[in-house]
Amino acid sequence: MYTKDTIVAIATPQGNGGIGIIRISGIDALEIAEKLTKKQLKPRYATFCNVYNDNEIIDHGIVIFFKAPLSYTGEDVVEIQAHGNPFILNLIIKAALNCGARMAKAGEFTERAFLNNKLDLAQAEAVADIINASSEIAAKSAAKSLQGDFSKEINNLLEKLIYLRMYVEASIDFPEEEINFLEDQKIHSSLEEIYKVILAIKNSCKQGVILAEGITLILVGKPNAGKSSLLNALAGKESAIVTSIAGTTRDIVKEHIQINGVPMHIIDTAGLRNSDDIIESEGIKRAIKKIQEADQVLFVTDDYTNSQVKFSDIKEIIPEFYDQIPKDIDITYVHNKIDLLKEVPHNHANHIYISAENNIGIDKLKEHILNKVGYTNQNESIYTARERHVTAINNAFEHIKLAKEQLELGNGELLAEELLIVQEYLNSITGEFSSDDLLGEIFSSFCIGK
């Protein structure tokens, strides 16, 4: 918990606006605010007043004092609502610094809220998720996490797990009771229930990560196969130049869209071929690098006569780059220009037939993309999650499986050890046991005013 210093920052986005908010938090927040306003501020009252630097008026606005612990950070907090001109706001910041405050670090207000038990770590991360949400569903899901829905699931699970651990360890510590707890049906049923709950949370977390972080799609293929046309069709607008000249796209073209509320980061790349053009060759190198970062690759081809096209075909197109491409990457083969066919083949497995230019098959392709990443559109029950949550849940799931094995083998002490490991992984999600390095990494990704 912070007790000795007071921080200040602009809490509203950069740029001009009707209102700009300065946030001050810490032990001297009230004293500093009263120096700036020359007013005595009452808790939870909106006070209209001038804001001064010494005796010079900087601006006027509304000032609200939130007395600890009834504030966002759990400390004394003052918010100054001034005119949203960056020069004015920076003058107020300088005046606050002159009165003894210091500039807040990124995410420091929310970090203080976490350290003062105003919210747990999962809720703190949801603050960033709700700010950065790029779709309505993502925003609603982040709000669920911020309200504590995700944390409640974890805490309810922890209660069951701790009760089971107490029972198991008590039985080990008091063998004179001559109770063979390993044959107790309560142990078996309780462990099975915990296993099923972790599995359900594991699946929900996967959905939550998709909403929070989106899906990165990369379009690759030979020149003039229709990658840029497909990008425009998916985006619903002309984001990339489309011509009949091979090699038109020479650099990475990015577009951010939504499919059924799921954020999609689509990347169009230079056509894959051997080229003497220095710029085009550099574009191809960048394309190969982006393939390694993708959640899913759309391999666009107009070779609609060959439904058995494989990613190894790249070896023939650009053999010098083939070894740099992950062989286990998730690929959908998009057969373009089916409007030239008399009879349209049926979609099968990872092969989808479309006409990007005529918008044929695009909806089926979108549906296929969502299915491939495992998104099930459970709007009402999804909360946002982070990759670290998924990692923790996956680890907890593996160890709860080991716990079941130890129970079947009759190894009581090893069962207790596995249950403890599961508890530690679950605790890391809400921040019960979190290293300083982890906290620093999480809160440094926030904007300054949060």
UniProtKB/Swiss-Prot annotation:
GO molecular function annotation: GTP binding; GTPase activity; metal ion binding
Pfam families from the UniProt entry: MMR_HSR1, MnmE_helical, TrmE_N
BP GO terms, sorted: tRNA methylation; tRNA wobble uridine modification
Residues binding (6S)-5-formyl-5,6,7,8-tetrahydrofolate, per UniProt: 23, 79, 118, 450
Every TrmE-type G domain range: 214-374
EC number: 3.6.-.-
Binding sites annotated in the UniProt record for Mg(2+): 228, 249
Presence of keyword tRNA processing: yes
Enzyme class: hydrolase
Residues annotated to bind K(+): 224, 243, 245, 248
Subcellular location: Cytoplasm
PROSITE patterns listed in its UniProt record: G_TRME (PS51709)
Binding site for GTP: 224-229, 243-249, 268-271
Quaternary context: Homodimer. Heterotetramer of two MnmE and two MnmG subunits.
Family (UniProt): Belongs to the TRAFAC class TrmE-Era-EngA-EngB-Septin-like GTPase superfamily. TrmE GTPase family.
Protein name: tRNA modification GTPase MnmE
